[in-house]
């Protein structure tokens, strides 16, 4: 499935902002803007507490959760109806697919509050570091959220609103009286049943009593209405188990346990037990001066409940089996790339630190993100990554500046598509990159988190050399000077896209730019454009028969609709050839 030759990382980096490229037979993804939540106006200041710090889809893709630096968790739910027809069948027939996942705001709740550790004289901020969905039951939503020290297990349920009915007084009889009017009414003679002594209508500014009063007293009745409210309830609090900041949580496929990781330890928890955890990984040396690496991320295998992986600041990924021993000091496999001789520098170890890892949906591959690259690892091949994708190679000459402003320590996340054919990660300037993983693919797309994801390319166009084939396929190259913006200024390294998530079943990405949540969807470019490019290229070569045969043999099998379109485009190609001749 994956590219064994290293993924053509250099060629991937050559594709600029808003561009994509692919070889024949490998359809590219056409990305479009879908939705935005919390979009800020031009010149509007962003509050620190509103910046999004975590994004996560649930396994079905029907719900999305975000956490922010203010300790809040916001839930979104999918609103569009799902098609009953097979998506793969529709793509095979080139049927137009206009639907894309649409979400709406569902609920929010305060997950964490700022705290103070009096024993260590340490402030614990409320920022949400990670969110993970748990298996649900009874139409409820369950998730884990964590800050630096405390993990909480939340259950969100729909509750019907209860109302009080059958009141003793008609709501229309209630006035707007005051205490003075009430005292006035008490001075007048009333019967024990509330009636007037003179058997006449008694009216004050509070209550209108009927003549003779009320014959009986009716108790209020509580009834459930059709209105539904979402109620978030904290079921468990898992605290006092980590001496260092928690950087990861991951739920197990057994639905009963999860892990939490800090810089030196990984703990195993049972969801139903909050006062006990088991330390399964401990990399703390007897003497802290001998410490050479720390844990940066940990993730459970998606299907094997006994397997998990964790990454380190030295760029290695260790796979451990919980069945080996209670304390997993020894790993079953280690994945690391050996550095080339003579290439070591002061920044080598810093940029090699892995900030995030993700398993593919089938559990066969691991995607890792270090500061400069994305790497795809095959669990069956620990000699090196099967693909390496350069994310922002143009920043390598600026590592000194990045070190001075601490940007070199930014932790970018990564994600894989549900089918495992694409990977994505963020960069600076609110950009994120999407790469193709199919064998031989050179697909690379750079998008900006805005309503117009191609805005950077439109503002700063270039005119590289193009062939007629690349023109027909819509291949566009970005600016050569990718380290500057449209005005020629250096990128503002504070505008960075750290967090993003891929929909588990569809080609849709949610990403966070400061306090704004942007969502994009993609459609595969129809193969008829590849057919057109091949026909037009053959036309440019003066219709030589051997060239025709070679071009047409490289075209993938066509569906019924594609065949009709191919005939139409063949006519265009012939016309173009006549003009050339």
From Swiss-Prot:
Gene3D superfamilies membership: YVTN repeat-like/Quinoprotein amine dehydrogenase
Molecular function, one GO term: protein phosphatase regulator activity
Stored InterPro entries: PP2A_PR55, PP2A_PR55_CS, WD40/YVTN_repeat-like_dom_sf, WD40_repeat_dom_sf, WD40_rpt
Compositionally biased spans, kind Low complexity: 14-25, 172-189
Region: Disordered, residue numbers: 1-27, 172-192
Positions annotated as WD repeat: 47-86, 123-164, 241-279, 290-330, 349-387, 492-530
PROSITE patterns: PR55_1, WD_REPEATS_1
Keyword list, A-Z: Repeat, WD repeat
Superkingdom: Eukaryota
CC per GO annotation: cytosol; protein phosphatase type 2A complex
Function: The B regulatory subunit may modulate substrate selectivity and catalytic activity, and may also direct the localization of the catalytic enzyme to a particular subcellular compartment.
Assigned protein family: Belongs to the phosphatase 2A regulatory subunit B family.
PANTHER family assigned to the protein according to its UniProt record, in alphabetical order: PROTEIN PHOSPHATASE PP2A REGULATORY SUBUNIT B
Subunit structure: PP2A consists of a common heteromeric enzyme, composed of a catalytic subunit (subunits C), a constant regulatory subunit (subunit A), and a variety of regulatory subunits such as subunits B (the R2/B/PR55/B55, R3/B''/PR72/PR130/PR59 and R5/B'/B56 families).
Protein name: Serine/threonine protein phosphatase 2A 55 kDa regulatory subunit B alpha isoform
Naturally occurring in which organism (per UniProt): Oryza sativa subsp. japonica (Rice)
Organism lineage string: Eukaryota, Viridiplantae, Streptophyta, Embryophyta, Tracheophyta
